[in-house]
Amino acid sequence: MSKFRTIFITIFQGVEAKNILRTDIFKELISHADIRIVFFVRTREKEDFYQKQFGHPRVFYEVVSRIDQGFWQSFFGSLKFKLINTATIDWRRRLAFEIHKSRFRFCVGWLLNRLLAHRFVRKICRSLDMLLVKDSTFAVFFDKYRPAAVISAHPFDDIEASLLKEAKRRKIKTFGLANSWDKITGRCALRVLPDKLIVYNDLVKKDAIDYVDFPNGDIFVGGVPHYDQHINQPKLSRSSFLEHIGGDP
C-alpha cells in the first residue's frame, strides 16, 4: 500500500497549466506531505519545460499525445457539438455558413442541433459513449500509480474524456474544471460528467445546470484561479515595475 495519495491532473493546454501550476492550487496540493501529483502533458518538450519550473520529488509528468481512435470515438467526438443549443452555437453556425457558403451544411447542422440538444438525448449519448468506445490509453497509468482522484482541467476535450472514463470504470473520484466563462455555452456537451464540477461564478454554475446537466449540489463556485494573484501577491511600485521591464522611470 502506497503511503501517498496520488492525484492525476491534466495540463494538456496552456490555460490548464496557468490555472493549476501558476496559482495557489499547486502550492496547496504539494504542501501536503502525503499527496503525490501526476501531471499529464502532450509532448516531451512540455514535460521538460514544466519539470524545470515545477519539479518536485512528489511530482511526476506523463506524456499522452493521442488516444485510441476508432469509429465510435470519432462519432461521439463529433456528436458532442450537436448536443447543446445556445445563442453562441447558433452564431458559430452562421459564421461557418459565411465562410463555407454551404446552405446544405447549415440546414443539416441546424436541424440536428434542434433534434438532439435535449437533456434526455445527452444522457443516452453518454451511456452509449461509455459502452461503445473502447479506449485503454490511460489504463497503464492507473495500474502504475493507483490514483485516489482525477482532476480534468478541461473536461470538454476528448483526450480528457478518455481519462475520466477510465476513472469512472475504476470507481475513482473525478473532478472537472470549466476553465472559461463561456466554455459551456460556446463549445460542446461533456461526453463524461465528472463527479464534481468547479466553475468560476454563479452564471457559469447556472449554465452547467442548464446545458451540462449537472446537479446543483455537485457544482462548486471557486472563482477564477489566476485572478488570486491580484489579491494575494504584493504589488510592485511604479518605479520597480519600470525597472523590471527596462522602462524609463
Describe the residue ranges of each PLM region.
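A nucleotide-sugar donor-handling region in carbohydrate enzymes
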Residues: 130, 193-249
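Active-site proximal beta-strand in glycosyltransferases
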Residues: 149, 153-154, 162-180
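Short, charged/polar "capping" segments at the starts of alpha-helices
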Residues: 17-18, 44-51, 159, 204-208
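Membrane-proximal helix-turn-helix segments that form the acceptor-binding/catalytic region
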Residues: 139-141, 165, 184-196
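Conserved N-terminal ligand/cofactor-binding loop architecture of enzyme catalytic domains
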Residues: 10, 38-138, 144
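Helix N-cap/beta->alpha junction signal
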Residues: 13, 43, 154-156, 180, ...
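A short, glycine/small-residue-rich beta-strand->loop->alpha-helix junction that serves as a flexible
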Residues: 10-23, 152
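A short, Lys/Arg-enriched amphipathic alpha-helix followed by its capping loop at the start of a domain
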Residues: 4, 24-35
